[in-house]
């Protein structure tokens, strides 16, 4: 049986990356929330 998680960096960044977050209002809310918590990694793309 094939596993459900088939990792792909491109798909990952397109859905959860910094540019994807910045493109929507709610995405920017996510980033501001993570900044307020002093997260070292805001998104998956910014390692």
Curated annotation (Swiss-Prot):
GO molecular function: structural constituent of ribosome
Compositionally biased residues, Polar residues: 1-10
Gene3D superfamilies in the record: 1.10.287.3980
Keywords associated with the record: Ribonucleoprotein, Ribosomal protein
Region Disordered: start-end pairs: 1-20
GO cellular component: ribonucleoprotein complex; ribosome
Gene Ontology biological process: translation
HAMAP family listed in its UniProt record: Ribosomal_bL34 (MF_00391)
Family as reported in the entry's similarity comment: Belongs to the bacterial ribosomal protein bL34 family.
UniProt name for this protein: Large ribosomal subunit protein bL34
Species per Swiss-Prot/TrEMBL record: Buchnera aphidicola subsp. Baizongia pistaciae (strain Bp)
């Amino acid at each position: 049986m094939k596993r459900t998680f088939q990792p792909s960096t491109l798909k990952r960044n397109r859905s959860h990356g910094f540019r994807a977050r910045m493109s929507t209002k709610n995405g920017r809310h996510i980033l501001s929330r993570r900044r307020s918590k002093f997260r070292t990694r805001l998104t998956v793309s910014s390692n």
